């Protein structure tokens, strides 16, 4: 879809949301659209929510390694403004019959034995920010 048409449609959706009190559920990989239209974001990986937060908080302070990698992959106009680049390596888990533990573990640079052995649950990190990652276990 042409970018200008896409912007017009998104603006129309936002106007309708404000006028009629609508709620939308967007499923997309286009993080620019997500940031523009969302007040709250849930990041999913192989069917599991790995992070959930208000939009500004998620973009300013991503906690889960997958969320960080997604945000690092957003193109920036000038390379000198890019702080870091995360590359997701490793093999995808089987989405039909996933191994125990975090589904992102086979591709995570921070993976520990705990990640491989138990499913992480969303933890409240404050300010409406939740993350499912052993890096944030107490």
Predicted regions mapped to residue ranges:
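Charged, flexible cofactor/metal-binding loops and thiol motifs
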Residues: 55-138
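P-loop NTP-binding/switch modules centered on Walker-like glycine-rich loops
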Residues: 1, 5-83
């Amino acid at each position: 879809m042409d970018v200008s048409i896409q912007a017009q449609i998104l603006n129309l959706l936002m106007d309708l949301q404000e006028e009629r009190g609508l709620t939308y559920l967007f499923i997309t990989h286009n993080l620019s659209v997500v940031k523009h239209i969302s007040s709250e974001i849930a990041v999913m990986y192989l069917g599991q929510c790995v992070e959930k937060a208000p939009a500004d908080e998620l973009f300013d302070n991503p906690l889960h390694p997958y969320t960080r990698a997604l945000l690092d992959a957003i193109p920036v106009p000038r390379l000198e403004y890019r702080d870091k680049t995360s590359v997701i390596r490793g093999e995808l888990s089987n989405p039909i019959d996933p191994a125990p533990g975090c589904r992102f573990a086979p591709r995570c640079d921070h993976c520990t034995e705990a990640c491989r052995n138990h499913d992480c649950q969303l933890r409240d990190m404050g300010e409406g920010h939740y993350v499912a990652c052993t890096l944030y276990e107490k």
